[in-house]
């Protein structure tokens, strides 16, 4: 259910774009992101950092898209999120006691420090590649293709990456890791 909630703004953007175009879809995504953050706050009594991060980017780039009537600003949004995520993941390898991926997953899986750092680097590289891929599609194809890529390509590549990561992790975990759950 949380995954669906997390994808709520992008799914709404996709549907509205198909019927009303990029500017209406951008406005709806901005409102959906704001609603998502408010609802999460009311329900759980705190904010989720990723929702706030995404909200800030969509308000700035979505606002610029609407103000200047230029879709290129919103097309940069996924790249901004991917590349800032890459920076945060990479930085966490040098700032703090543990890489970010370890902080996120260590309650569910037991890995060596070396593997946590490799996994963190893999996510960093994944985010860099996805940001570059978004720009490639945005600049080499029309907006219809970019919108489809944004939803289906972004989600598809992420799921594929997680699946590959799961296979990699099975070689580096022991049975006790899975007994925790």
Curated annotation (Swiss-Prot):
Superkingdom of the source species: Bacteria
Topology of the protein relative to the lipid bilayer: Multi-pass membrane protein
Record-linked InterPro entries: YciB (IPR006008)
Residues spanning the membrane: 3-23, 54-74, 81-101, 119-139, 149-169
Cystine pairs: none
Location(s) in or outside the cell: Cell inner membrane
Pfam family for this entry, one: IspA
GO cellular component entries: plasma membrane
Keywords assigned: Cell inner membrane, Cell membrane, Membrane, Transmembrane, Transmembrane helix
Sequence similarity: Belongs to the YciB family.
Functional description taken from the UniProt entry: Plays a role in cell envelope biogenesis, maintenance of cell envelope integrity and membrane homeostasis.
Protein name stated in the entry: Inner membrane-spanning protein YciB
Organism listed in the record: Legionella pneumophila subsp. pneumophila (strain Philadelphia 1 / ATCC 33152 / DSM 7513)
Taxonomic lineage: Bacteria, Pseudomonadati, Pseudomonadota, Gammaproteobacteria, Legionellales
Name of encoding gene: yciB
């Amino acid at each position: 259910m949380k995954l669906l909630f997390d994808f709520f703004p992008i799914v709404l953007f996709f549907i509205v774009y198909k019927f009303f175009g990029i500017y209406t879809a951008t406005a709806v995504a901005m409102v959906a992101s704001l609603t998502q953050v408010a609802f999460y706050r009311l329900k759980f009594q705190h904010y989720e950092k990723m929702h706030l991060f995404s909200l800030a980017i969509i308000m700035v780039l979505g606002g610029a898209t609407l103000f200047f009537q230029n879709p290129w600003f919103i097309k940069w949004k996924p790249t901004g999120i991917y590349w800032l995520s890459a920076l945060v993941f990479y930085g966490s390898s040098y700032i703090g006691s543990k890489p970010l991926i370890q902080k996120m997953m260590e309650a569910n899986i037991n890995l060596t420090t070396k593997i946590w750092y490799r996994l963190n680097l893999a996510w960093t590289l994944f985010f860099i590649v996805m940001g570059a891929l978004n720009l490639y599609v945005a600049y080499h194809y029309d907006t219809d293709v970019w919108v489809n890529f944004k939803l289906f390509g972004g989600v598809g590549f992420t799921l594929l990456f997680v699946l590959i990561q799961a296979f990699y992790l099975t070689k580096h975990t022991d049975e006790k890791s899975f007994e925790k759950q």
